[in-house]
């Protein structure tokens, strides 16, 4: 089962992605052997995957400018069948991200231009039954989250601000949160499920029922950019009614993005899901 109307809330910006062997020492030159430009930001990445799965999804988050980069983002939403009616347009430069991907697929991000942005008020965005929020937007919507209807399934991608509000599912890298903090969030009932992910180690699903270890397929990571977003997008799209299968699908989505740098199709997700092992830890 999927949700009927999904809102992907968070960062909206063009990405400039540079593939390099490694970052130089301070003061050195960065030489890239390949680059690409794409519509990015967590809200965009999640919505792009969900729309690709044929589901109804919209975006909201930071304002964008009426400049060339803003036009580029809108054109992408139109071409991807993503609802953008809630986006705020302001007289400022559209924020951007420069992403440096090393030979191991790990990324270093420079984000710019968010200081001038306004953010959507969640109270003004209605008629969604599933909400995906990213860690960067939390400072601007923290109070709004506390008033979101309990009928809305909330997925958070990433962890930065302390969680003092109720969410259903947290998808987070092991680098962003430790197990002690994850267990606290579960025990104090701020979060129902936490999926701790890693690019090269087994993932963990933590809940009040215990811990499950998830062994992903042996994919070589070529670009981890957007892999966590694809994982969160799957949970935000399909929820936890069929928990084990949906967690497998979420992990498969992330693995496909990291290993191929392509949008995961439902057919490919099903194929890769069969290679994922889940067992009690």
Residue ranges and their predicted role:
Residues 2-12, 74-89, 100-213, 244-245, ...:
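Ribokinase/PfkB-type carbohydrate-kinase core domain
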Residues 1-60, 261:
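Glycine-rich phosphate/adenosyl-contacting loop at the front of the ribokinase-like
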Residues 53, 80, 92-95:
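Short, basic and Ser/Thr-rich N-terminal targeting/leader segments
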Residues 52, 193, 217-281:
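Conserved post-catalytic alpha-helical subdomain immediately downstream of the catalytic base
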Residues 56-85:
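A glycine-rich beta-to-alpha transition motif near the start of alpha/beta enzyme domains, typified by
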């Amino acid at each position: 089962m999927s949700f009927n109307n999904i809102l992907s809330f968070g960062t909206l910006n063009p990405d400039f992605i540079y593939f390099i062997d490694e970052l130089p020492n301070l003061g050195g030159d960065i030489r890239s052997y390949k680059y690409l430009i794409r519509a990015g930001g967590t809200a965009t990445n999640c919505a792009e995957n969900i729309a690709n799965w044929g589901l109804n999804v919209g975006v909201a988050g930071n304002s964008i400018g009426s400049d060339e980069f803003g036009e580029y983002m809108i054109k992408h939403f139109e071409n991807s069948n993503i609802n953008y009616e809630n986006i705020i347009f302001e007289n400022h430069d559209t924020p951007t991200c420069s992403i440096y991907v090393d030979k191991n697929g790990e990324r270093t991000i420079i984000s710019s231009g968010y200081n001038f942005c306004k953010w959507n008020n969640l109270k003004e965005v209605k008629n969604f039954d599933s909400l995906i929020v990213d860690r960067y937007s939390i400072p601007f919507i923290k109070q709004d989250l506390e008033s979101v209807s309990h009928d809305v399934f909330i997925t958070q991608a990433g962890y930065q601000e302390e969680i003092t509000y109720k969410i259903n599912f947290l998808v987070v890298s092991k680098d962003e949160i430790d197990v002690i903090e994850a267990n606290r969030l579960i025990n104090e009932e701020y979060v129902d499920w936490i999926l701790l992910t890693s690019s090269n180690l087994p993932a963990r699903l933590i809940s009040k029922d215990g811990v499950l270890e998830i062994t992903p397929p042996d994919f070589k990571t070529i670009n981890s950019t957007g892999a966590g977003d694809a994982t969160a997008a799957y949970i935000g799209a399909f929820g936890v009614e069929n928990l084990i299968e949906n967690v497998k699908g979420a992990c498969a989505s992330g693995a496909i993005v990291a290993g191929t740098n392509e949008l995961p199709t439902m057919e490919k997700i099903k194929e890769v899901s069969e290679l994922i092992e889940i067992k009690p830890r």
